[in-house]
A protein has these predicted regions:
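Conserved, single-site charged/polar hotspot
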Residues: 1-272
Length: 272
């Protein structure tokens, strides 16, 4: 492993450890960069489902008020080899993994211009906030899928698509209305049936959606998934507190809120 700190560089042999904490004076001089010729770097202070994860590429260590930031600079194709098996069971098969690889690659490329972690010199993190990365063992099947689709991305009218994806659908994909945007402005995100049935219900109708969501259609791809249909119980005091914490800012922004009674708009208008 090659270690660079300021203008000083030294090497440690494979299998040896390099220990550092937030009180280490070397961090005050700038970032510490760890690299290898063609190997991986294991970080013993990080735990993932496979144990201590190993990383290709460079590891940068930088001191911030919250502690030491660990930044992994890595080639996108190598990155994808650790995203694909972390986001999809490899038991789904190589063709499904190829689809996942294209989605993950498209999403990754769209993130190269974001500024979410610019203060750390990074684009994304390794969690579900972006894409889960390096959270399971390496997989030959996932590697094969990434290699077979190398460079392939999703495009719409010549533009790269930010390919949002999820673990389980209710039988339909979501469109941009989920984020309050106009679906007509984003036709690439049209809601479609996620199954083999040709029937398409008007799930924008409150009544039709209730009928749909309370039933189960075995033709839906995710019909056997645990989260295909689910329910939860929220106490009235908890729900009231949550509602009250949000209603003030909503009214200041929107001016009024319409109260629904039995799923239909009422003539009551609550203004702030």
């Amino acid at each position: 492993i090659h270690i660079t700190c300021a203008d000083v560089q030294w090497d440690i042999a494979a299998g040896e450890s390099f220990d550092i904490d937030s009180n280490d004076e070397r961090l005050a001089t700038g970032r510490i960069v760890l690299s290898t010729d063609d190997g991986s770097i294991t970080i013993n202070s990080i735990k993932r489902s496979q144990g201590n994860p190993s990383y290709k590429g460079n590891i940068e260590l930088a001191l911030y008020d919250e502690g030491i930031a660990v930044i992994n600079e890595i080639d996108i194709e190598d990155y994808l080899k650790k995203v694909v098996p972390s986001e999809m069971p490899v038991s789904f098969g190589v063709n499904a993994l190829k689809c996942q690889a294209v989605c993950a690659r498209s999403y990754a490329y769209t993130q190269l211009t974001n500024n979410y972690y610019s203060e750390y010199g990074a684009h994304i993190d390794d969690s579900v906030s972006f894409q889960v990365y390096n959270n399971t063992y390496d997989s030959a099947e996932a590697d094969e899928a990434v290699i077979a689709t190398a460079g392939m991305v999703a495009v719409y009218n010549g533009e790269l698509v930010k390919t949002y994806y999820y673990s389980t659908s209710c039988g339909y994909t979501a469109d941009v209305c989920a984020w309050g945007s106009d679906e007509d402005n984003y036709p690439q995100y049209a809601s479609v049936r996620a199954g083999t049935s040709d029937y398409n219900a008007d799930i924008k109708s409150e009544k039709t959606f209730e009928q749909f969501i309370t039933a189960k259609d075995s033709s839906d791809y995710d019909s056997e998934a645990d989260m295909y249909r689910w329910k939860t119980v929220i106490g009235i005091s908890e729900l009231t507190a949550h509602f009250n914490s949000l209603i003030g800012s909503y009214l200041r922004k929107n001016g009024s809120v319409y109260i629904l009674e039995n799923g239909e708009p009422s003539d009551k208008d609550c203004k702030h």
